[in-house]
Regions:
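Accessory, non-ATPase domains that flank or precede helicase/AAA+ motor cores in DNA-metabolism machines
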Residues: 1-286
Length: 286
């Protein structure tokens, strides 16, 4: 806690030096709120990098990147600088989702294939997608950490610190989780990367995909983007061969019914609709 104008405000101690680098009077720190680190040198450098990219103040990003502190949770964690994040090969891939399988279920083999390399961060568009991904991972005996604003302040802050200090974690969260300083992070997965929910509503309007691309390069992380089709931005990167496009071959059965006498739907189509309804929802596109 430091004095700023006529009030006290929170700050982050980023370094300690023997002598000041600037002339003039310096204000003293009023109070140390916590001895538990909430950021690493690397994560603060990355926030500065993203701030430069979006031409904004780093604090505009810190409010998204670091959850509010809860004093009672700090007592459960030992003070000390978290280990540097290890990184991976830095490859970037777009995995096209198959049409006949639930999207969240298709992340399970991706996680299994990359788990040995280190911790994995999965960023999903919204709370519903996060819960579906977590349920799929738990169905194969994995224990992911949830990191979203829908958690209570205590749960969110606790999980944030667990992600910083735990080893080989699987963290699943919404867009703010892209900044989380996860220990031994090796792989980042941006699920449904073209979703509008990956865009921050507050200034400077950053989005998960762009921040993930910056982080992949900054930390040499493996980055996997998923979706049924790539966004325009990712399509350009695929054309430029900066992103590898991966998909599986799928066969789709197509039936054509010729309308008769101006009917909106041909009579013969209703038998197929009834059969399809026994399996799942039916979508009509006019």
């Amino acid at each position: 806690q430091v004095p700023f104008g006529n009030r006290e405000t929170e700050g982050i101690v980023v370094d300690r030096v023997a002598a000041p680098e600037r002339a003039g009077d310096l204000k003293s720190i009023t109070k140390v709120l916590s001895v538990v680190p909430i950021a690493t040198t690397q994560s603060l450098q990355f926030i500065d990098l993203v701030a430069q990219h979006f031409a904004c103040n780093p604090w505009d990003l810190i409010r998204s990147a670091i959850p509010p502190r809860v004093a009672s949770v700090d007592k459960d964690f030992v003070s000390g600088e978290p280990s540097p994040q290890m990184g991976s090969k830095g490859a970037i891939e777009f995995h096209a989702l198959a049409p006949f399988t639930q999207a969240h279920e298709q992340l399970v083999p991706l996680v299994a294939a990359h788990q040995k390399a280190g911790s994995i961060l999965i960023v999903a568009p919204d709370e519903k997608d996060v819960d579906l991904v977590i349920a799929s991972l738990r169905s194969v005996a994995l224990s992911p950490l949830k990191l979203t604003a829908a958690l209570t302040r205590e749960e969110r802050y606790r999980n944030f610190l667990f992600a910083m200090h735990g080893s080989n974690s699987i963290v699943v969260g919404t867009r703010s989780a892209i900044f989380a300083p996860i220990k031994n992070l090796a792989t980042v997965i941006v699920h449904k990367e073209s979703s509008h929910d990956h865009y921050e509503l507050r200034s400077p309007g950053w989005n998960t995909r762009t921040v993930a691309l910056l982080r992949s390069k900054f930390q040499s992380l493996k980055l996997i983007l998923t979706g049924f089709s790539p966004s325009i931005e990712v399509s350009q990167l695929i054309d430029e061969r900066k992103v590898k496009y991966l998909n599986s071959k799928e066969n789709v059965n197509v039936k054509a019914f010729t309308p008769s006498e101006g009917a909106l739907l041909p009579g013969r189509i209703f038998g197929d609709i009834k059969k399809a309804l026994a399996v799942g929802p039916v979508l009509f596109i006019a």
